[in-house]
Amino acid sequence: SSAASDVYKRQNNTIPGYTADIDNYFSKYREHKLISYIKKIREEQGIAYDAVPAATGCIEIKRGKVIIDPQCDASKISMIDSRWTEESFRTFVRLLNDFYRQTKFKDFYTLHRGLYDIAETRLNTILVDLNAEWFKSMFGEGPENTIVVASLCNGPGNYAFNGITKGEKRGIVIGCSTDKEGNPAYSRFLITVIVHELLHHYTNPCLAQYWSQIDSASQIIYPHVKEKMAKLAYGSTNSTMIEWFNNLLTIMYFKDNPNRGFTATHLTAWRQHEGFIWMERSMTFMEHFRNHRNLYSTIKDFMPEIVSFVNYTASDFDNVLKEYDNKAVSYTHLRAHE
């Protein structure tokens, strides 16, 4: 439950019949302690948006109970998302288990199995085009063990969740739109979102490892794009650079795996327009990686070069701004895909 929060409600993108079923089935449990606790940790700890799916990988249902995954070290939950504490997470899972049992949640789930099957089948038609081998060639491991969750009650919102250790689950949560029959539907453009979210599992650790070497340069870049980043809900230097790097690798995926309807050039222009105004430079720079794979077997091997690029870009940002301002590019056609 979103506990009366509109964080996960997107009025025009939910599945009306399913939303009504949720409200009708669970409304009599509004006073359950879980609901008041969710409100409490949302207000006091900011547990909302991606903090909720961030904890998903540490929860499982086993023998009719909601429990903390034995593979997950609850004492390190704050390493997955700093808004959680071990105490709040354990309390949340305990109350969630009680809610699960009191509401006979499995009965609700079984009643809607047909709807879930539609979502699963339709999402799989998008996933079938994913080139898992590309991930392996770029990072040394593929996404085969990544869980893809079809979410039917938070509109088009998409999230990624990571474990701390190799034994813990990692995955992505994919939202949906609806068709005229009120069933979950997915645009073929969603493949860009799926690739983007999957890449976070690889790019975030890479950037984190080298963050101390690009921190100062990132602090120089960020003020120039802060206003545009705020519109994208990237409210810090760190989140801005994480998204820049992840977007860069996403574009590289589509450069290597062309998709009808949107090209790497199109995606680069789109990201430039959003505020990552050094993206064209970034793609030009990455040709060095693509043309010298004999020297760089994976992106990890290339990270020192990425560090040098970020530092140089920061020192030359006046020219980056001039280049961007001088480009007379129309982005109107891009908006149809946003």
Segments from the language model and where they lie:
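Conserved small/polar residues in nucleotide/adenosyl-binding loops
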Residues: 3-11, 331-338
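N-terminal accessory alpha/beta regions
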Residues: 10-86
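Auxiliary, metal-adjacent structural segments of Zn-dependent hydrolase domains
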Residues: 112-167
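Active-site scaffold of zinc-dependent metalloenzymes
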Residues: 161-186
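Active-site recognition of the HExxH zinc-binding catalytic motif
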Residues: 188-208
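Post-HEXXH active-site segment of zinc metalloproteases
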Residues: 205-229
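Pan-zinc metallopeptidase signature
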Residues: 250-330
